[in-house]
Amino acid sequence: MNEIIRSDAATLAARIAAKELSSVEATQACLDQIAATDERYHAFLHVAADEALGAAAVVDEAVAAGERLPSPLAGVPLALKDVFTTVDMPTTCGSKILQGWRSPYDATVTTKLRAAGIPILGKTNMDEFAMGSSTENSAYGPTRNPWNVERVPGGSGGGSAAALAAFQAPLAIGSDTGGSIRQPAALTATVGVKPTYGTVSRYGLVACASSLDQGGPCARTVLDTALLHQVIAGHDIRDSTSVDAPVPDVVGAARAGAAGDLKGVRVGVVKQLRGEGYQPGVLASFEAAVEQLTALGAEVSEVDCPHFEYALAAYYLILPSEVSSNLARFDAMRYGLRIGDDGSHSAEEVMALTRAAGFGPEVKRRIMIGTYALSAGYYDAYYNQAQKVRTLIARDLDAAYESVDVVVSPATPTTAFGLGEKVDDPLAMYLFDLCTLPLNLAGHCGMSVPSGLSPDDDLPVGLQIMAPALADDRLYRVGAAYEAARGPLRSAI
């Protein structure tokens, strides 16, 4: 296999800047890998070869002219989850209702990537409107896990994770509403980070649940993820939920972690996120990771988060409620698909026909649940109570951080499950987000870093590291130190 596509992003960037490799060569190598393998994995919904090569050529011209490059990742190609708007590519969000739709504007994340000189290879597959845990809810067919094509790559951002694992791209962008970056990262042995809520702009990120959604970086190493995090983070006046605070030095933290130990770092193990219901191999991998953190000098203790028990129920009331509001905009008048527009139907009938044909079953399910939870007779009993539980979960984590610096848990309760195994059992699918969604409810930051392969089935397992809001640098210090001590893992292909 081409050594270019197996290189990490930091190495590629250094070689491009040193004129040892051109960005066009690196981008073409990734495009060739996509062409050779994506029929098998279906990680991409749209490939933008000409646009990517054009952006790469601009970087090469700057290198040749001796100009200062716009970012430490200039020239390194990237895969973008199809939930971020792009003027030069379709944005479908994995849904038929947006089939062929092109946005009139770029998302802020897209704009920052372009300004950083990062060629965008294309848009990756995802569960429809980011609702799902397996990428099986995409209207355009499921993505397959490169570790085992009969298994799911996780979701909703399985396309971005699979693209990394299949060496189709060295970098990727995802979005995380209840674990959609971290969970696929765990199932594909890649690194995924959910930044602190509000630190990466949501402008142009098509909303699923506005108080939970957060864009974030994905890569194959902690340092690469940090370099990408630094590119996309920062305050944005176009996003009313954007936090006007300095971006932590995540790159410096990653470098320090990789070069040092964890002496003095206090690590908490969440009592509620281990034990019954977890696959034995996942627990074994997690316990080994905790032992490794201890060997690095970390002070490990158990922390109690009693309201995590109610996180799943609260999440699956809050999220559908926001979904039912956000997806009301897809009314057959302004976007994409339109059914029954032949003059024989009223506007209401056109809307009903279009939404019935354009939305998949999981999206319809969540719209109905959310509409019910927000209805006059049930608002206080369901939605209001869920928001109170959300506050208690955030307080649990705040209390934990009084005695520890980071909290750790398995990233998922099991390894990747089989394609079709849970698609007809929504509750089983929802339970798969058990480890990741409390963090979204609290608005804090989290990372999944590979912790090896399960002895049960030889499939990847992820270690989840969590930190308080605006302490994203702690994730990178601990994650990089653990990654260096763990050593290299074999790849999927």
Curated annotation (Swiss-Prot):
GO terms for biological process: translation. The active site is at K81 (charge relay system), S156 (charge relay system), S180 (acyl-ester intermediate). One of its GO terms (cellular component) is glutamyl-tRNA(Gln) amidotransferase complex. PROSITE patterns: AMIDASES. It comes from the Bacteria. It catalyses: L-glutamyl-tRNA(Gln) + L-glutamine + ATP + H2O = L-glutaminyl-tRNA(Gln) + L-glutamate + ADP + phosphate + H(+). Keywords: ATP-binding, Ligase, Nucleotide-binding, Protein biosynthesis. One of its GO terms (molecular function) is ATP binding. It holds the Pfam family Amidase. It is an enzyme of class 6 (ligase). Its EC number is 6.3.5.7. HAMAP family: GatA. Allows the formation of correctly charged Gln-tRNA(Gln) through the transamidation of misacylated Glu-tRNA(Gln) in organisms which lack glutaminyl-tRNA synthetase. The reaction takes place in the presence of glutamine and ATP through an activated gamma-phospho-Glu-tRNA(Gln). Belongs to the amidase family. GatA subfamily. NCBIfam families: gatA (TIGR00132). Heterotrimer of A, B and C subunits. This is Glutamyl-tRNA(Gln) amidotransferase subunit A. It comes from Mycobacterium avium (strain 104).
